[in-house]
Amino acid sequence: QTQQTLDNIDRLLAEAGTDKTHILSVLIFLKDIEKDYAAMNAVWDAWIAEGHPPARTCVESKLYAPDVLVEMTVTAVLPD
C-alpha cells in the first residue's frame, strides 16, 4: 500500500505541476506503527528524492477503512 500511495502522490504532484523534490512536509498515518513502520520506511527511502528529504511525521491512527494500512498528507510547493 505504501508504494501505491507514493505512486498516487507522484501522479497528483505532476498534475499540479510539481514533483517530489518540492515536497515540504509529509504526515504519515499507519494503522499499526509497530507492525508496518519498517516496511513503509524502506519503500519511502527508495522513493524519496536524494538530497530533498521533507519534514516528516509518522503516527499511528485508526484509518477510514479496515483494509487501509497507510495514508499520507503531503504539502508541496510549485517550482518557480
Report the location of each language-model feature:
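Short, polar/acidic, helix-capping and beta-turn segments at strand->helix junctions
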Residues: Q1-D80
